[in-house]
């Protein structure tokens, strides 16, 4: 199977076409993944409305745009000017510390939830313990404000029985933690108008910066977890830091080096990455097999709030 982490439409279409062509057994277009369904244009429109004064209040829940947005300081400055700002959060993070009101929410291990990661693949998350503190789940608060007498658990149960289980028992699904529905999963063909011959050829004198998330740390929501910080990157084997990955060819051309010091630790060159407004300095890792003309930098590092001092590692690539 061929995969890509790029959100570029052309790249995604090329990968789909390749998997269709090689008839990959691991590739199933009839059951797509449904995660990462955010809408960047809606978010950008909201920021423009904040700037123009069309929005006088904002509520955030389970997100930290004060850390993950590009030029997040500009967003936080806009939030500070609002008449009303409320953050539902488990931590005093960058966003919470800039809102007028903060509502403490329970940890995900204290909460109910359901998910559909892939088409027809439904999952339940159950609380493992009672909430340690006097907190209310965000969904329960919304139900209360809407005048409902149900709690979020009741709504999940009702929705599963009505729209998902189709005669199967709720108790069995609760015990298993999941339910698979294979309806409407007939194989489909890919139709693409993309002309590969019209795609631009990469000029290797220029460098493309690829921002990605690591397998262990992800987007940084759990960066205060030392076990995840200690999780070695499957490719570089590096822990407790992010870095700029560079191909051998580009490293040689730019005079970048890696070397081992007396205790066996890996050391090397540092580079400055700039977007014309902000700059960050990061160590370089020369990565065998990386495509010349590309450099990679992991997101999820460089957090400064809701973190103990020893966990403040890496740079914020957002």
What positions do the PLM features span?
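Conserved strand-helix element at the start of the C-terminal RecA-like helicase core
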Residues: 2-3
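Gly/Ser/Thr-rich loops at beta-strand to alpha-helix junctions
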Residues: 7-11, 64-66
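Alpha-helical scaffold segments in soluble metabolic enzymes
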Residues: 13, 17, 45, 49, ...
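Anionic-ligand anchoring segments at beta-strand to alpha-helix junctions in alpha/beta enzyme folds, i.e.
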Residues: 15-42
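Active-site phosphate/pyrophosphate- and oxyanion-stabilizing loops and adjacent acidic/basic residues
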Residues: 16, 20, 73, 93, ...
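A cross-kingdom feature strongest in bacterial/archaeal respiratory oxidoreductases
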Residues: 32-36, 44-132, 160-318
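Non-catalytic, well-ordered alpha-helical segments in soluble enzyme domains
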Residues: 136-161
